[in-house]
């Protein structure tokens, strides 16, 4: 470190996580420079320059015990974290420090968490499908390799369980490296996830970065960037990497807290005025280049189940596929509780997924939409008042609805049913048989919580 890097300043004000530090006027730190409290590992990140040598910083750690007059040193560079293979199999915090008690991370390469998004001419769009083994996702909202996917849902409809199943199915099949960023979620879930990865022997291919619910807003705001920086490094080395974020809403919420602490005027619903810019900075970096790809799966909490809330609404525009989880479907006991009429994907195009897949998807959605329209009539007048065609549509729709459910590997301990991975060909074949009327003679309960259509036929035999 040069002597210029060790310019010292003094704390002049502490308000919660916001710390004002005074430096000599001719050597003020730059925006996003990392400052370190003398005699401790506490890091502060410069957010504003107030003039007269004073900078306003956000504390990346607990501010307990801080007081005016303490000495702070300027590192003269942004927060940098270790990247590369030494991070695999490790749990790190927002600063890239290990928190798994397995010794230091022996990485020679570090990288700043603030990077520019790749230039337009470096991007590489892909239409190659990524099979997940989850019927409703592969059929209704297929994922693209190198694409961005959002799992939208309110509290308790299964975002994290769906995310875990996707990790289980894709990360194990994929065989490449994955990065998991736990942004403001429960520590218990982070612990469960670590042990899940360890038990399935894929931990040596996953880097875990956690900034959990109990941490200060600065940590939760920056931890997504820490995880993304690690994923970008693997991509720039020419690898195809999976990047999981749980939960992108907590990133926004941390931004709101920081914004309020910094004294900015709030915008709609109390969110920060820079919401779109902050989300754009993060999302534009999650992209595939000619060197390698980042396939990203992000859980997005929907406050009060309102998809028009500014936070989920801002996220929508950045995604290639949106998987919307519905409380109404969850209340029917159908899991995964994916809404097949609300969920979309840019891959739903006959030129990308093929004519057969496209037509089956649209026919399934038409049948379900017809059932949705008829539900009020059924509630008031009953099934008997429907025409024979409508009765048939309703029967098929109810079978489709149940066939969209599936037992998950990660939920085996709760359900007692072994998890099922259903290949895309089997998914298309099963739904084709239902919409073509080849399963009209089977009872609808035979389709609930099965994998392939053959299992539904076997279950029907047991029922009858």
Swiss-Prot record:
The keyword DNA repair does not apply. It is found in: Cell inner membrane. It comes from the Bacteria. It is a peripheral membrane protein. The keyword Transport applies. ATP binds at residues 153-160. Gene3D superfamilies: 2.40.10.170, Bovine Mitochondrial F1-atpase, Atp Synthase Beta Chain, Chain D, domain 3, P-loop containing nucleotide triphosphate hydrolases. Its main location: membrane. Keywords: ATP synthesis, ATP-binding, Cell inner membrane, Cell membrane, CF(1), Hydrogen ion transport, Ion transport, Membrane, Nucleotide-binding, Translocase, Transport. Its EC number is 7.1.2.2. It catalyses: ATP + H2O + 4 H(+)(in) = ADP + phosphate + 5 H(+)(out). One of its GO terms (molecular function) is proton-transporting ATP synthase activity, rotational mechanism. GO terms for cellular component: plasma membrane; proton-transporting ATP synthase complex. Produces ATP from ADP in the presence of a proton gradient across the membrane. The catalytic sites are hosted primarily by the beta subunits. NCBIfam families: atpD (TIGR01039). F-type ATPases have 2 components, CF(1) - the catalytic core - and CF(0) - the membrane proton channel. CF(1) has five subunits: alpha(3), beta(3), gamma(1), delta(1), epsilon(1). CF(0) has three main subunits: a(1), b(2) and c(9-12). The alpha and beta chains form an alternating ring which encloses part of the gamma chain. CF(1) is attached to CF(0) by a central stalk formed by the gamma and epsilon chains, while a peripheral stalk is formed by the delta and b chains. HAMAP family: ATP_synth_beta_bact (MF_01347). Belongs to the ATPase alpha/beta chains family. This is ATP synthase subunit beta. The lineage of its organism: Bacteria, Pseudomonadati, Pseudomonadota, Betaproteobacteria, Burkholderiales.
């Amino acid at each position: 470190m040069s002597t210029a890097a060790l310019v010292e300043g003094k704390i002049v004000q502490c308000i919660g996580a916001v710390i004002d530090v005074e430096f000599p006027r001719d050597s003020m730190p730059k925006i996003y420079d990392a400052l370190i409290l003398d005699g401790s590992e506490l890091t502060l990140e410069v957010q504003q320059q107030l003039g007269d040598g004073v900078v306003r910083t956000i504390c990346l750690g607990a501010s307990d015990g801080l007081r005016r007059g303490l000495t702070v040193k300027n590192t003269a560079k942004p927060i940098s974290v270790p990247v590369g293979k030494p991070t695999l199999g490790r749990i790190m915090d927002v600063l890239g420090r290990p928190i798994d008690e397995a010794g230091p991370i022996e990485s020679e390469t570090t990288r700043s968490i603030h990077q520019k998004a790749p230039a337009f001419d470096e991007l590489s769009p892909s239409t190659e499908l990524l099979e997940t083994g989850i019927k409703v996702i592969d059929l209704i909202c297929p994922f693209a390799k190198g694409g961005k996917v959002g799992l939208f849902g309110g509290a308790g409809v299964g975002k994290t369980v769906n995310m875990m199943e996707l990790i289980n199915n894709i990360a194990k099949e994929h065989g490449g490296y994955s990065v998991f960023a736990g942004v403001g979620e429960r520590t218990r879930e982070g612990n469960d996830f670590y042990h899940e990865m360890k038990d399935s022997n894929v931990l040596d291919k996953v880097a875990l970065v956690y900034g959990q619910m109990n941490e200060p807003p600065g940590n939760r705001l920056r931890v997504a960037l820490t995880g993304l920086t690690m994923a970008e490094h693997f991509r720039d080395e020419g690898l195809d990497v999976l990047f999981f974020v749980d939960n992108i809403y907590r990133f926004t919420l941390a931004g709101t807290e920081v914004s309020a602490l910094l004294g900015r005027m709030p915008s709609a619903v109390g969110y920060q005025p820079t919401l779109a810019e902050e989300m754009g900075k993060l999302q534009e970096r999650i992209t595939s280049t000619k060197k390698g790809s980042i396939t990203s799966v992000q859980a997005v909490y929907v406050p009060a189940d309102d998809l028009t809330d500014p936070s989920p609404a801002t996220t929508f525009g950045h995604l290639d596929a949106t998987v919307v989880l519905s409380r109404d479907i969850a209340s029917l006991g159908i899991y995964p509780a994916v809404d097949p009429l609300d969920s979309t994907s840019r891959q739903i195009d006959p030129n990308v997924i093929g004519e057969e897949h496209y037509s089956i998807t649209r026919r399934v959605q038409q049948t379900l939409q017809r059932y949705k329209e008829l539900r009020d009539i059924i509630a008031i007048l009953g099934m008997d008042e429907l025409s024979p065609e409508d009765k048939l549509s309703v029967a098929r729709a109810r079978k489709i609805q149940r066939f969209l459910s599936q037992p998950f590997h990660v939920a085996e301990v709760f359900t007692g049913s072994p998890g099922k991975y259903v290949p895309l060909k089997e998914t298309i074949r099963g739904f084709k048989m239902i919409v073509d009327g080849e399963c009209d003679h089977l009872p609808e309960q035979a389709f609930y919580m099965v994998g392939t259509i053959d299992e539904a036929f076997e279950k029907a035999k047991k029922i009858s």
